[in-house]
Curated annotation (Swiss-Prot):
Domain notes per entry: The flexible hinge domain, which separates the large intramolecular coiled coil regions, allows the heterotypic interaction with the corresponding domain of SMC6, forming a V-shaped heterodimer.
SUPFAM superfamilies recorded: P-loop containing nucleoside triphosphate hydrolases, Smc hinge domain
Region (Disordered): 818-845
UniProt xrefs under InterPro entries: P-loop_NTPase (IPR027417), Rad50/SbcC_AAA (IPR038729), SMC_hinge_sf (IPR036277)
Cited function: Core component of the SMC5-SMC6 complex that promotes sister chromatid alignment after DNA damage and facilitates double-stranded DNA breaks (DSBs) repair via homologous recombination between sister chromatids.
Biased composition (Basic and acidic residues): 818-828
UniProt protein name: Structural maintenance of chromosomes protein 6B
Tissues/organs with expression: Expressed in seedlings, rosette leaves and floral buds.
Positions that bind ATP: G49, Q50, N51, G52, S53, G54, K55, S56
Subunit structure, interactors included: Forms a heterodimer with SMC5. The SMC5-SMC6 complex is composed of the SMC5 and SMC6 heterodimer attached via their hinge domain and from the non-SMC subunit NSE4A or NSE4B.
Keyword Kinase: no
Organism: Arabidopsis thaliana
Length: 1057
């Protein structure tokens, strides 16, 4: 523990600068010394010597050098008493170290400060010198600044404890005296005195300010009374001024009342005159209606006459077709009867031919039996030839089938190649379309306006800018450039599908601006521009909830926004966006459009492009159209990126189709080569087949010739009859065929004529119905014409008997009012000019009767107020200003004083609180440290400090005291115990104060050897550990003090007898 403490002490000492420590003290003719110089170490210094050797004079000289008064040293009454007997002056010179961070003005004094005080019989002088001994200052303020800088208070017992102060404490058993010692040693006494002094000064200053403020209260009361009088007088003046103004207003109110009547009459005339064009418009409307109905009547009569002629001709034509149809039916019936008769005759001949053939067969069978052997050989040969023909025929058929199969494959290959070519064309067309869209989007990205009309709209906007003075209000457009989407670009394509060309339209405020804008459009070569006329002054429409479709799906109105309310109003009026609903897909859109028949629902648009709506009872669904990039997107970058990706996909599809086309061409060439080869093989097989068939035919002819050579007259006759009958059958069948063709033609003719007759009859029915309908319309037109003529006569009578007479009467009244206004203006101008009335502000619309009543009431009030006051308001104001000037400066000065006193009081309260807290902490610290030092001798103790009672009591318990009684008075201790406890108390105080050096004189008196040894060891350890410079003066032997490099011992010379 000792070693670790020594290491910590050494590290602290290395950081210590030693600034403010005493290097040496020189005295000349001071007390008992003629010339004495003592040098001190920076750490612990012991000075010993016999009584009378002048040890205590060193501390006295140190105190005198730092400005202490003679009584403060308790060694003399005046400073001149310190001059050695027989001398006329005394000099005390102290050299201080001045280096490190805590140095005092090192740039002036250097590393050493010399303080020299010269004392004479009549005066004293203090001089501060630098390290070279050169004089720097002789002012006491400089010395005081030096002392405060290093915190050197030689009157503080913790800095310099003289032998008198030590004895005073040792012999004091009074708790109040001990408290005074502690209070002074810890500088609490000094701070407390300063705070008390400040509080007294503040109290006195506050009382002075209160007294000064009381001196001006009578004047302030008088000022307050004057202020009330002035305020009342000002009100009287104000009433008089208002009375004059009201009189002037009354004069002009008659004029303004006539103006009001003139305005009302003018408005009445305007309204009456507005009835003229309205009435005339109705007359013109009815006149136009009459003329239109007359024209329609003329046309309808001509139409009825024409229809009558056409119906007559149609009846004749219908009768003609009816006769033709009857004739054709009769011809068809006659041909049918003849055809049936011929068919029966042919059938009879065929029956006779079959009987003859049976007879010939019987004869031939008999002949065949005779020539069976020869025929057997011929049949074998024929059979062989037939087999060969069959083989070749099979080969030819197989080759033909293979050829047809490959031809079909080649045909399919051509169709596939044509399909691929069509796909390539479609993909190329799609790619060109996407590239065009990308170029358009890039152009829109540069200028969004071009999305709604291209370059034409740019030219149009430039034309509008050139002609902007011709417009009553600047046109708004194109509408699409003023429309934004609220929640992203999700519904962009659906919104654009719904609004369509309305996005390209422009809005103007009236018809004149519409014509001007049309001229600008022609100038910009923008034909067919859609122009909407709408009142710009109308606020944004507020659509009630019950007027929109009740569905959770959004409407177009809910997903769009605009910086211009007119644009939204136009979209509501023109397109009904509040009734157009958006849906995610086809199924949801179908459920919304056709599910519940929602009220106020106009149309439903889906994300995939379907449009659904009702037209009467019919459900209508329009398929998606070709999708183009949306023009309403906030940013076109994403669309351009998607289209570029789509264009890249189309290019990949084109490349794949080109590769498939090449493969298809190669396959087609192979198939065509195979077809050519098969054709060649088939031609060879057909040649072989022809040869075999000719050979087989020749053999059959030979056999037939042999058979004919046989003598068979009966067979020949029968054959001739059969041939004759067959020829007749062929002749009759040919005739039947011709007859059948004639029958078909007759049937077709009859059917055609019958259909024409039916069609003609149906057409005639329509013509007759049209004729009847035209007659009904003609009657209705005649009735409407009579009604329109009656309405025209009615409005003409209103114009003649009502409108024009009312206007004439109103104009006569207007002229009378003008004359009356002129007279009233002349009378009012004599009272005051109209500009004076205008300067009072805008007219509030008061009538002459109201102003007359106000004037009467104000005259009565003014009369009452004038009776209460005798002084003039100017005199009152002069008195008020005089008194205000008299006390204004004083009041400001007193207020400033009070604010400063309050700030000082707040600061004093804050410092007093800090002082009490520090005093409480010092009390605890003193008890802990005192008990710690006592413990080194095995003694325990406690210090009780009462700031309220100003007492300090010490309790000490000795280790050998078996009774455990606590000694509460130092007089009850032995001399050594009292000296040791005094030392412990002093060390505790030392730890609580800071100073560059400390000095103690005769600290070990009345101590026994053991207490003295313990006290010296504790004192030396504390001094070395504490770090500041220490000076110990004792008359006793200090050989028992341990040797240390930081301990310096000096022996004073013995006194001369």
């Amino acid at each position: 523990m000792v070693k670790s403490g020594a290491r910590a002490s050494d590290s602290f000492i290395k950081q210590r600068s030693g600034s403010g420590s005493i290097l040496r003290i020189k005295v000349e003719n001071f007390m008992c010394h003629s010339n004495l110089q003592i040098e001190f170490g920076e750490w612990v210094n012991f000075i010993t010597g016999q009584n009378g050797s002048g040890k205590s004079a060193i501390l006295t000289a140190l105190c005198v050098a730092f400005g202490c008064r003679a009584r403060g040293t308790q060694r003399a009454a005046t400073l001149k008493d310190f001059i050695k007997t027989g001398c006329s002056y005394a000099v005390v010179q102290v050299e201080m170290k001045n280096s490190g961070e805590d140095a005092f003005k090192p740039e002036i004094y250097g590393g050493v400060i010399i303080i020299e005080r010269r004392i004479t019989e009549s005066a004293t002088a203090t001089v501060l010198k630098d390290y070279l001994g050169k004089k720097v200052s002789n002012k006491r303020d400089e010395l005081r600044e030096l002392v405060e800088h290093f915190n050197i208070d030689v009157e503080n017992p913790c800095v310099v404890m003289s032998q008198d102060k030590s004895r005073e404490f040792l012999h004091s058993g009074n708790d109040k005296d001990k408290f005074k010692f502690f209070f002074k040693a810890t500088l609490l006494q000094q701070v407390n005195d300063l705070l008390q002094s400040i509080y007294e000064h503040l109290t006195k200053a506050t009382a002075i300010v209160d007294e000064l403020e009381n001196t001006i209260k009578p004047i302030e009361k008088e000022i307050s009374e004057l202020r009330g009088k002035i305020k009342n007088m000002e009100q009287v003046e104000e009433i008089a001024q208002r009375l004059q103004q009201l009189k002037k207003k009354l004069a002009w109110s008659w004029v303004y009342d006539v103006d009001r009547q003139l305005q009302e009459q003018t408005e009445k005339i305007v309204k009456l005159k507005e009835r003229i064009p309205t009435c005339q418009a109705k007359i013109d409307w009815e006149l136009g209606k009459v003329e239109s109905l007359r024209d329609t009547l003329t046309k309808k009569k001509a139409q009825v006459a024409c229809l009558m002629d056409e119906s007559t001709a149609m009846k004749r034509e219908i009768e003609s077709f009816h006769q033709s149809a009857k004739t054709a039916v009769r011809e068809k019936i006659a041909l049918q009867e003849e055809f049936n008769h011929k068919c029966n005759y042919v059938q009879k001949i065929k029956d006779r031919v079959r009987r003859l053939e049976r007879q010939v067969g019987d004869i031939n069978e008999q002949t065949m039996k005779n020539t069976q052997a020869e025929q057997s050989e011929i049949e074998e040969k024929l059979k062989y030839l037939e087999q060969e023909v069959e083989k070749v025929e099979t080969l030819r058929s197989r080759l033909k089938e293979e050829e047809n199969c490959f031809l079909e494959k080649a045909f399919e290959g051509r169709k596939k190649m044509e399909h691929i070519e069509d796909m390539i064309k479609n993909h190329q067309k799609r790619q060109r379309f996407i590239t065009s869209n990308i170029n358009d989007l890039k152009k829109h990205q540069t200028n969004k306006v071009t999305a709604f009309g291209g370059d034409r709209v740019i030219n149009l906007l430039q034309a509008i800018e050139r002609n902007h003075r011709r417009f009553r209000k600047p046109p708004i457009g194109p509408i699409g450039s003023h429309v934004t989407l609220v929640n992203g670009n999700k519904w962009a394509s659906s919104v654009e599908q719904a609004l369509g060309t309305l996005l390209n339209a422009f809005i103007v405020t009236d018809h004149k601006d519409s014509l001007t804008l049309r001229g600008c459009a022609n100038e910009a070569n923008y034909r067919n521009l859609k122009i909407i006329i709408y009142d710009f002054s109308r606020p944004r429409l507020n659509i009630p909830r019950h007027m929109v479709p009740q569905t959770e799906h959004p409407t177009i109105f809910s997903v769009i926004d605009s910086d211009n309310p007119t644009v939204l109003n136009v979209l509501v009026d023109q397109s009904g966006v509040e009734r157009q609903v958006l849906a995610e897909n086809y199924e949801e859109g179908k459920a919304v459009a056709f599910g519940k028949r929602l009220s106020n629902l106009k149309e439903v648009y889906t994300l995939d492009g379907y449009k659904m709506f009702f037209r009467g009872p019919v459900q209508t669904t329009l398929p998606p159209l070709s999708r183009r990039p949306s023009r309403l997107c906030a940013s076109f970058d994403d669309q351009i990126k998607d289209l570029e990706i789509e264009a890249s996909k189309e290019q990949n599809e084109i490349n794949q189709c080109m590769r498939r086309k090449r493969e298809a061409e190669e396959n087609l060439e192979e198939l065509e080569l195979k077809v050519r080869q098969l054709k060649k093989h088939r031609s060879q097989a057909e040649k072989v087949l022809t040869t075999k068939e000719l050979e087989m035919h020749d053999l059959k002819n030979t056999v037939a010739a042999e058979i004919e050579a046989l003598p068979s007259s009966s067979v020949n006759e029968l054959q001739r009859e059969i041939m004759k009958d067959l020829e007749e059958i062929d002749e009759k069948e040919a005739f039947l065929e011709k007859l059948q063709n004639c029958l078909k033609e007759a049937e077709l003719k009859a059917n055609k004529l019958t259909a024409l007759f039916e069609n003609m009859r149906e057409s005639a029915k329509g013509e007759i119905d049209a004729f009847e309908e035209a007659e009904n319309e003609l009657k209705k037109i005649e009735k409407d014409l009579q009604s329109a003529e009656a309405e025209k006569i009615h409005y003409e009578n209103i114009m003649k008997n009502k409108v024009l007479p009312d206007i004439k009467n109103a104009e006569a009244n207007y002229e009378e009012l003008k004359n009356k206004r002129k007279e009233s203006d002349q009378k009012a101008s004599e009272i005051c000019p109209e500009s004076e009335i205008e300067s009072l502000g805008p007219w509030d619309g008061s009538t002459p009767e109201q102003l007359s009543a106000q004037i009467t009431r104000m005259n009565q009030r003014l009369h009452r107020e004038n009776q209460q006051f005798s002084e003039s308001i100017d005199d009152l104001r002069m008195m008020y200003e005089s008194l205000e000037r008299k006390i204004a400066k004083k009041r400001k000065s007193y207020q400033d004083h009070r604010e400063k006193l309050m700030a000082c009081k707040n600061a004093l309260d804050s410092r007093w609180a800090k002082f009490q807290r520090n005093a409480s902490l010092l009390r605890r610290q003193l008890t802990w440290q005192f008990n710690a030092h006592l413990g080194k001798k095995g003694i325990s103790g406690h210090i009780k400090v009462s700031y309220e009672n100003k007492t300090l009591s010490i309790e000490v318990k000795m280790p050998q005291d078996a009774t455990s009684n606590v000694v509460r008075d130092t007089k009850g201790l032995s001399g050594g115990e009292r000296s040791f406890s005094t030392l412990c108390f002093a060390l505790a105080l030392h730890e609580m104060t800071e100073a560059p050096f400390r000095a103690m004189d005769e600290f070990d008196v009345f101590m026994d050897a053991v207490s003295r040894k313990i006290s010296l060891d504790a004192l030396v350890d504390f001094a070395i550990g504490e770090g500041s410079q220490w000076m110990f003066i004792t008359p006793h032997d200090i050989s028992m003090v341990k040797s240390h490099e930081r301990i310096k011992k000096q022996q004073m010379a013995a006194p001369r007898s």
